[in-house]
């Protein structure tokens, strides 16, 4: 591989791997590009900044920045960018050579080392006119047109150092010159190495290791000796030769380097090739599942190298690098800024990434440098403090987000070009764009037309050549500079702020990026978008951000809006990119934010003029969907919320990972940390009469509008022995709220403040003191102090208002929370500590909200039309005369659904009937997926949309869907088929017996008949049972145990998630899909076999009979209950007949009495049966072994034809399938019986279990009512009791992800109730007289939103989605019979009425701890998510299930969606609401299944072996008892079936895998052998 580079006939580089090749001068020729990206060394060489001077005269050169070997075309992975050439050359005679590197150079680099020759011809030895500054860190003195670096007076190479020549000063008479030039000189200079009468011109390039070998025969001092460049104290120097030391002949050098320079004759235009979109093979970053080329790894690599440096990197190097990046970004932005907001996709994908990536890397590296902030020691800078100082770790992690950190420094880069500048970061600034620059030695600081010059020891501040202010320096020699969106603040001994416009808008569609670039740098979001750079802001928003004259933007916005519809900012994004809408939303929010920030900085008069014009554009920017905004990006969400409120949109996205910055207090932290206070309330020593707990503060730095207090350790508690642990300062509406916590007993504090009034209240909770400091009365600067004495008491005030106007915040749990401007909410509790103001007086009181009680009133029926639900939570418009009933009887009786507590207000006496609602919130344990199910990826992808963090949390849901759709559904189908076939077999086999029946046998025969009828009923019930709601209910039962238990589950095609079956989870039952003979055309000889096995000892009949009686009664009730369910669901009847109700009550009474009286006997019987089953399983194992031996004998005598082999294999496959079914069904049985066993133990112990409500708990709940002062008796009708003994049927509306809700309501009648007996905090508050009246307190544990039932007159009311539905009958599901209950407070006669057509119109606002819904004519949408909840859903059968994050599992997420027309399109209700009475008592009674397409008749009568008779010997009498026994096992009523199945299954699998073809059970005793011919006739032996 070789490269040849030529520039006209001037200079040629021959580059190859081993020798020199002569190529004619001409166009650049190369065999292949160097296949390596930039190396670290090349980047280092790029980063030097050269100032060209002609002798001492400053010349203006048409170049903006340079690399050491400056290129006109930079290539990174085939990406070419053209730059302007900086270097001019002269011949040694002084004749101008021209620009060597003008538009014809490019550079490539390699990670490997190249050795190549450099040939220079006669007369081609240019010199460089350069400037060398005299700096404190070393360098040459004065100005030199030609810098000559000789080799120590031409002394020979000495032994004391490395052999060869060294470059540098000072001269040395002995040894090797070791001192090198510091890079504080502008590096990249041409030096002539003196050799005799000739000069060899070398280019000194830092950070490049070169070895120059001068061949023998060439004159020069270092002939035949390598020329080394020593490493200095901390910087390696590299030297590169551009010429020879001989003028009279051509010369050749051999160079070794890891980078090459190429020349070409003609510069080509910058073209972004299509290859740019293709990922780079060497460096690829995977962002959000998409491979993206990482063009900036070289920058990251360089800065990583910088951060590892042992000593401080040189400041000039950093400055030059910043300039280089700055110019690159300007060039690239110009290239891609042809149309407004850049619709060029290639530009977007490639070039525009560079600026943000560079600056992101730059700032992140700054924070990794190991520097510390040191304020000037003794207020004096030390002499060597001339380099950048930045903090290391104090701004990582929780202290500051990356967004705040980068915003802080987005303007700092302006000042990095001044060598003698120290950079400081304040610790807890109230605004994130405050920074401090200490400029002591710099004579001039300039940015655009903003200048600060040192003149006669003073700082003169200029804007556009106009002197604005002259400042006296701080005693420390320090000035501090900050910019607040073009509002400059300069602080010295005296401070000033002024408005200085530093940027201008040039032409439409092209911004003056070159003057505004350094202001654009934006934080990357902290959420999932963090891997996506934000070039949208780099060009489009930067102009909005920077230009202070907002009126200049009106024509631009108008034109942009007219050209780019429908979206205001249609940013030409490739719609296939992941999270593109989120990216666009991000840019729109930030653009609106910048416009708003500029807007609020304008004078009031200009605001009024421009506000009307600006509003539609801001609202257009905010027209994005809330779902498109990444809720985990705290900065974006906070800005969006503020903008929404600021510009009249009353809704907001309120999903936070943490509190947004705008809710933070001015200070919140430990004592001793830094604090910020407004300057006007800064404490002084004036008027201080006595020592205060807040001692005066001195030595602070005044800065802009703030006073910074570096440390404040002098806060103390009234009791001197105590130290305050928390000091919090909040600023709200001209008031400072200070909370001080001292853990001690109660005490009083007295405010001692001079020059104004403050309000200090004694501890509202133990150890917490609240101090109110009105900032408007403290402008004189009083001293803040607290003195022992009498403080104001906290008054308790009763109010009927839900929201208190003229209140600014509330204190709860030692935290102050600002309220919405409309006022603060009041809850039904005594812990509402609210700060309010009246005129100039501030108050701190404990408010308690009271509302009139609600009596029982008659209810009229109003028909409503209902449809399938489309929302989770329903809201209504709140008029002055009505509001939604959101608590059981708001203001009357309050029921805490978590504790059962009951509360009556106002001490009045009532006669009331109500329900105590019992809620069971059942969330199964997290499921571990077996390895065979690990690739269920489609479900996770469907739910998580590529969010990898979501995948872990979504496994529970996916697993539940699999259970729901696969295992249980198929198990029920298989079981139903088996029951039907077993019923047929019993009918078929019984008449064939020829035994003489004894009385015992006849009794057993009758038992079989009864069992047969029961199975028939049960199989019919299963058909009705296969509804979605029933499936969900049974899935819940099966869920109780560890999911799957290691068994591989089948896939079902056509499911809602459209999965493809994985190979490891395809069940064998899919193999039998059609009814075909198992084996056909098999010809074998007729043979009769008689295999005898010993009969295992069966469990005692007495044990089975006791269980059997429970079984039979349970089955009859189940069939009745399911029949009722079927009738109701079909809606063919509206009322149950009296006979049905009586039969139902009779059966319930039977079950109730039996369960209550006999559960101990059942438990004892189960234990006895379990031991018998264990013994039986061991005997069965022996019997199966005997069967195996008998089958071997049969096998040896059978014909070995190919037909028989085929039959054997097919039958073995079938038996394997049968065992698989049995295994999976057994797993379902385990999970079911575990649930029942748990309930039995719960009945026995009286302890509430997570899945079982027991009679004893019911009476415990009744005790709550008995403890009241009045007389309360529970309504204990048989109908009501039945609600507690039937497992509740979980409908679709009650299943949320992995959480099930079971609810019962206990009816209680109370009379003469007195006073407030139990106090609870209701979840919802309604005030019908206030327009902003709906508050949702954030739930702390189980939410009460979907619980409870009310009974008014003869109506039974259950709450669905915050609406009470009431019907005359608990079984009446006709939509026309439902009423929607709303609370009305029309007159003094408080009444409950029903309104058929409420109209919703909600809006939402979120405070940091409370959620409000506001209702007004302007609001039309309300979407609220409380907690860290993702708003993702999955729809199944017209029902929408939320997929929730683990932090809000359950009902911690509240979602309000509207507008919704309530009336003919009423959408708040499920089409099938859960029944008030849920009878779904089901027993799995048999666990045998056969392949699809076959029944028992096929197996017993016609086995499809045409020429073979099979013998199946059975003892009919024992078979009856065995069938009863098997049915009892599978019913789930005994505890040790697991041991039996686990002992039995391995034996079955063992002999099945041997390939035996027959399955025959022969039991000792009376053997009756049945012969079945192929014509089906039966012979008897």
Swiss-Prot record:
Residues listed as glycosylation sites in the UniProt record: 25, 384, 494, 574, 935, 969, 1267, 1297, 1385, 1389, 1428, 1431, 1438, 1483, 1487, 1495, 1515
GO cellular-component term (any): membrane
Cited Pfam families: Spike_torovirin (PF17072)
Intravirion compartment residues: 1573-1581
Localization (cell): Virion membrane
Protein's GO biological process: membrane fusion involved in viral entry into host cell; symbiont entry into host cell; virion attachment to host cell
Functional summary from the UniProt entry: Mediates the binding of virions to the host cell receptor and is involved in membrane fusion.
Signal sequence interval, chain numbering: 1-20
Virion surface face of the membrane: 21-1551
Alphabetical UniProt keywords: Fusion of virus membrane with host membrane, Glycoprotein, Host-virus interaction, Membrane, Signal, Transmembrane, Transmembrane helix, Viral attachment to host cell, Viral envelope protein, Viral penetration into host cytoplasm, Virion, Virus entry into host cell
Membrane topology field: Single-pass type I membrane protein
Keyword Membrane: yes
UniProt similarity note: Belongs to the toroviruses spike protein family.
Transmembrane regions listed in the UniProt entry: 1552-1572
Xref: InterPro entries: S_torovirinae (IPR031412)
Membrane listed as a keyword: yes
Stated name of the protein: Spike glycoprotein
Subunit structure: Homotrimer.
């Amino acid at each position: 591989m070789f490269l040849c580079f030529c520039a006209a006939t001037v200079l040629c580089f021959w580059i190859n791997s081993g020798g020199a090749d002569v190529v004619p001068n001409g166009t650049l020729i190369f065999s292949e590009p160097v296949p390596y990206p930039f190396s670290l060394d090349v980047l280092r060489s790029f980063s030097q900044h050269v100032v060209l001077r002609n002798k001492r005269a400053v010349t203006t050169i048409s170049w903006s920045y340079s690399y050491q070997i400056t290129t006109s075309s930079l290539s990174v992975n085939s990406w070419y960018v053209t730059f302007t050439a900086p270097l001019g050359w002269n011949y040694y005679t002084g004749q101008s050579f021209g620009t060597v590197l003008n538009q014809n150079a490019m550079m490539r680099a390699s990670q490997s080392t190249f050795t190549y020759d450099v040939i220079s011809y006669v007369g081609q030895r240019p010199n460089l006119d350069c400037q060398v500054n005299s700096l404190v860190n070393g360098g040459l003195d004065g100005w030199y047109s030609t810098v000559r670096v000789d080799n120590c007076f031409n002394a020979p190479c000495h032994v004391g150092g490395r052999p060869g020549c060294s470059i540098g000063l000072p001269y040395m008479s002995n040894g090797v010159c070791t001192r090198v030039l510091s890079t504080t000189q502008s590096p990249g200079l041409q030096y002539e190495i003196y050799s005799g009468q000739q000069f060899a011109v070398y280019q000194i390039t830092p950070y490049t290791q070169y070895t120059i070998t001068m061949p023998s025969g060439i004159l020069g001092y270092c002939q035949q000796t390598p020329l080394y460049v020593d490493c200095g104290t901390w910087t390696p120097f590299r030297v590169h030769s551009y010429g020879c030391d001989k003028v009279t002949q051509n010369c050749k050098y051999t160079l070794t380097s890891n980078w090459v320079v190429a020349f070409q004759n003609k510069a080509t235009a910058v073209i972004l090739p299509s290859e740019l979109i293709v990922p780079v093979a060497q460096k690829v970053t995977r962002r959000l599942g998409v491979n993206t080329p990482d063009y900036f790894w070289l920058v990251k690599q360089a800065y990583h190298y910088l951060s590892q440096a042992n000593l401080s990197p040189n400041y000039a190097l950093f400055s030059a690098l910043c300039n280089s990046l700055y110019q690159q970004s300007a060039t690239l932005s110009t290239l891609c800024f042809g149309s407004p907001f850049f619709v060029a996709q290639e530009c977007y994908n490639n070039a525009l990434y560079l600026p943000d990536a560079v600056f992101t890397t730059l700032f992140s590296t700054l924070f990794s440098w190991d520097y510390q902030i040191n304020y000037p020691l003794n207020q004096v800078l030390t002499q060597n403090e001339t380099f950048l100082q930045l903090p290391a770790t104090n701004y990582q992690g929780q202290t500051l987000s990356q967004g705040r950190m980068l915003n802080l420094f987005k303007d700092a880069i302006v000042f990095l070009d001044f060598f003698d500048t120290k950079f400081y970061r304040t610790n807890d600034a109230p605004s994130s764009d405050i920074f401090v620059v200490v400029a002591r030695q710099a004579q001039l600081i300039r940015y655009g037309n903003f200048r600060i010059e040192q003149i006669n020891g003073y700082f003169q501040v200029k804007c556009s050549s106009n002197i604005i202010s002259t400042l006296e320096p701080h005693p420390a020699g320090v000035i501090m500079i900050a910019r607040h969106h073009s509002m400059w603040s300069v602080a010295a001994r005296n401070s000033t702020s002024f408005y200085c416009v530093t940027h201008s808008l040039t032409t439409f569609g092209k911004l003056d990026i070159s003057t505004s670039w350094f202001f654009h740098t934006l934080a990357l979001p902290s959420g999932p978008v963090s891997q996506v750079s934000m070039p949208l802001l780099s060009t489009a928003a930067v102009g909005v951000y920077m230009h202070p004259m907002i009126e200049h933007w009106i024509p631009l916005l108008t034109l942009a809006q007219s050209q780019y519809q429908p979206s205001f900012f249609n940013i030409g994004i490739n719609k296939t990119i992941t999270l593109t809408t989120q990216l666009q939303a991000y840019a729109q929010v930030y653009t609106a934010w910048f416009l708003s920030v500029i807007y609020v900085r304008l004078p009031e008069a200009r605001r009024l003029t421009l506000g009307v014009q600006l509003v539609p554009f801001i609202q257009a920017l905010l027209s994005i969907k809330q779902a498109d905004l990444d809720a985990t990006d705290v900065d974006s969400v906070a800005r969006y919320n503020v903008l929404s409120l600021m510009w009249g949109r009353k809704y907001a996205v309120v999903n936070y990972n943490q509190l947004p910055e705008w809710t933070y207090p001015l200070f919140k932290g430990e004592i001793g940390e830094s604090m910020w206070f407004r300057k006007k309330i800064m404490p002084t020593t004036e008027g201080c009469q006595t020592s205060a707990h807040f001692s005066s503060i001195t030595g602070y730095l005044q800065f802009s509008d703030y006073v910074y207090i570096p440390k404040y350790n002098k806060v103390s508690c009234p009791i001197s022995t105590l130290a305050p642990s928390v000091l919090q300062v909040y600023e709200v509406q001209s008031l400072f709220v200070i909370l001080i916590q001292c853990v001690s007993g109660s005490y009083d504090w007295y405010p001692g403040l001079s020059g104004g009034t403050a309000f200090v209240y004694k501890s509202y909770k133990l150890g917490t003191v609240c101090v109110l400091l009105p900032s408007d009365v403290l402008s004189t600067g009083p001293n803040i102090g607290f003195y022992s004495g009498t403080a104001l008491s906290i008054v308790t005030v009763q109010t009927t208002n839900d929201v208190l106007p003229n209140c600014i915040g509330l204190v709860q749990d030692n935290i102050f929370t600002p309220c919405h401007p409309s006022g603060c909410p009041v809850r039904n509790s005594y812990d509402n500590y609210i700060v309010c103001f009246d005129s100039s007086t501030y108050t701190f009181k404990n408010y308690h909200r009271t509302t009139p009680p609600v009596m029982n009133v008659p209810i009229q029926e109003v028909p409503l039309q209902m449809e399938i639900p489309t929302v989770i939570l329903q809201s209504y418009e709140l008029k002055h005369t009505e509001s939604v009933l959101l608590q059981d009887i708001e203001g009357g009786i309050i029921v805490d659904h978590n504790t059962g507590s009951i509360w009556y207000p106002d001490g009045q006496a009532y006669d009331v009937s109500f329900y105590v609602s019992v809620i069971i919130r059942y969330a199964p344990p997290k499921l571990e997926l077996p390895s065979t199910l690990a690739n269920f990826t489609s479900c996770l992808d469907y739910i998580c949309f590529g969010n990898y963090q979501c995948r872990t949390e979504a496994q529970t849901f996916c697993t539940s869907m699999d259970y729901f759709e696969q295992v249980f559904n198929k198990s029920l189908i298989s079981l139903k088929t088996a029951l039907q076939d077993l019923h047929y077999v019993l009918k078929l086999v019984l008449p064939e017996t020829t035994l003489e029946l004894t009385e015992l046998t006849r009794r057993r025969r009758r038992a079989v008949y009864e069992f047969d009828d029961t199975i028939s009923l049960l199989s019919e019930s299963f058909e009705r049972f296969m509804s979605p709601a029933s499936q969900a209910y049974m899935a819940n039962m099966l869920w109780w145990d560890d999911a799957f238990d290691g068994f591989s589950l089948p896939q079902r095609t056509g499911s809602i998630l459209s999965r493809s079956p994985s190979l490891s989870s395809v069940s064998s039952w899919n193999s039998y899909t059609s009814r075909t003979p198992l084996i056909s055309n098999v010809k074998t000889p007729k043979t009769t076999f008689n295999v005898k096995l010993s009969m295992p000892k069966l469990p005692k009949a007495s044990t089975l009979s006791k269980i059997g009686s429970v079984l039979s009664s349970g089955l009859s009730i189940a069939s009745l209950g399911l029949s009722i369910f079927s009738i109701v669901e079909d809606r063919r009847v509206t009322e149950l007949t009296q006979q049905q109700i009586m039969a139902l009550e009779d059966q319930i009474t039977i079950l109730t009495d039996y369960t209550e009286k006999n559960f101990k006997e059942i438990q004892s019987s189960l234990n006895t049966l379990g031991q018998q089953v264990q013994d039986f399983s061991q005997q069965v194992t022996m019997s199966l072994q005997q069967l195996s031996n008998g089958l071997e004998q049969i096998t040896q005598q059978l014909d070995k034809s190919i037909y028989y082999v085929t039959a054997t294999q097919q039958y073995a496959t079938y038996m394997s399938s049968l065992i698989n079914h049995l295994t999976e069904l057994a797993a379902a049985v385990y999970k079911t019986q575990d649930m029942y066993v748990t309930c039995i133990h719960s009945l026995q112990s009286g302890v509430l279990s997570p899945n079982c409500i027991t009679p004893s708990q019911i009476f415990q709940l009744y005790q709550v009512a008995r403890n009241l002062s009045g007389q309360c008796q529970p309504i204990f009708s048989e109908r009501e009791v039945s609600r507690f003994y039937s497992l509740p049927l979980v409908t679709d509306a009650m299943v949320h992800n992995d959480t099930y809700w079971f609810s019962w309501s206990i009816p209680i009648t109370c009379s003469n109730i007195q006073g407030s007996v139990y106090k609870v905090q209701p979840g919802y508050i309604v005030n019908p007289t206030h327009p902003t009246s709906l508050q949702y307190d954030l739930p702390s544990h189980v939410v009460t939103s979907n619980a409870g039932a009310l009974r008014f007159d003869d109506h039974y009311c259950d709450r669905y989605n915050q609406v009470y539905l009431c019907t005359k009958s608990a079984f009446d599901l006709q939509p026309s019979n439902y009423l929607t209950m709303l609370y009305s407070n029309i007159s003094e006669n408080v009444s409950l009425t029903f309104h058929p057509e409420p109209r919703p119109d909600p809006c939402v606002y979120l405070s940091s701890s409370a959620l409000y819904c506001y209702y007004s004519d302007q609001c039309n949408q309300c979407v609220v998510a409380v907690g860290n909840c993702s708003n993702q859903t999955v729809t199944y059968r017209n029902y929408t299930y939320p997929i929730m994050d683990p932090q809000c599992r359950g009902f911690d997420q509240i979602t309000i969606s509207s507008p919704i027309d309530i009336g003919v399109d009423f959408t708040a209700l499920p089409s099938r609401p859960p029944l008030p009475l849920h009878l779904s008592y089901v027993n799995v009674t048999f666990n045998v299944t056969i392949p699809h397409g076959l029944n028992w008749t096929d197996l017993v009568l016609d086995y499809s072996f045409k020429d073979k008779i099979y013998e199946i010997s059975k003892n009919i009498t024992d078979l009856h008892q065995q069938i009863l026994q098997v049915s009892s096992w599978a019913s789930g009523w005994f505890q040790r079936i697991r041991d039996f199945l686990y002992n039995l299954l391995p034996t079955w699998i063992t002999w099945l895998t041997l390939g035996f073809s027959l399955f025959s059970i022969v039991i000792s005793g009376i053997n009756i052998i049945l012969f079945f011919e192929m014509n089906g006739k039966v012979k008897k032996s």
